[in-house]
Regions:
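Nucleotide/phosphate-binding sheet-loop regions of phosphoryl- and nucleotidyl-transfer enzymes
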Residues: 1-149
Length: 149
């Protein structure tokens, strides 16, 4: 099976063809020991497979992503299933070349109606928590349902 997902610590700046610019730069910052949250990049090849497969993930890619999500839960000590210890993700698209403002981003993936209340409690800032949730919903709709910004 061809590797399609790379943890940040598995890459470097020379891997822009495989990881895209953002992915390669995150990998390089991790390699240099800079404070980068643990994460992973889905390869450009996997993205091409997705596009060529009728906008559908293969079973193998789904399993690989699930494996990396489980590793993130372990390394972060957080979980999508634990409202007391919420794992929130940033999902960013990237390309080989920098295109500021052209690529999609979804922040705070993992927030929902139940755990946003806990985020408000642990941050002691209800407005902040609900603003994060509002941004998630807005960006999710823009990116996945083609709503206008």
């Amino acid at each position: 099976m061809t590797k399609r997902v790379y943890r940040f610590k598995e890459g470097n700046a020379e891997m822009k063809e495989i990881l895209g610019g953002k992915g390669a730069n995150l990998a390089e910052m991790t390699r240099l020991g800079l404070p980068v949250p643990d994460g992973f990049t889905i390869s450009t090849e996997a993205c091409m497979d997705y596009l060529n497969n009728g906008h559908s993930f293969t079973t193998e890619l789904k399993k690989e992503i699930e494996k990396y999500l489980e590793q993130l839960e372990v390394s972060s000590g957080k979980s999508f299933d634990d409202p007391e210890n919420i794992m929130l993700l940033s999902v960013r698209s990237g390309a080989k070349f920098s295109m500021p403002g052209m690529m999609d981003t979804v922040l705070n993936l993992g927030l929902n109606d139940e755990n946003v209340e806990h985020l408000a409690k642990i941050t002691n800032d209800e407005a902040f928590a609900y603003d994060c949730y509002r941004r998630l919903l807005k960006n999710f709709c823009v990116v996945f349902f083609c709503f206008y910004k």
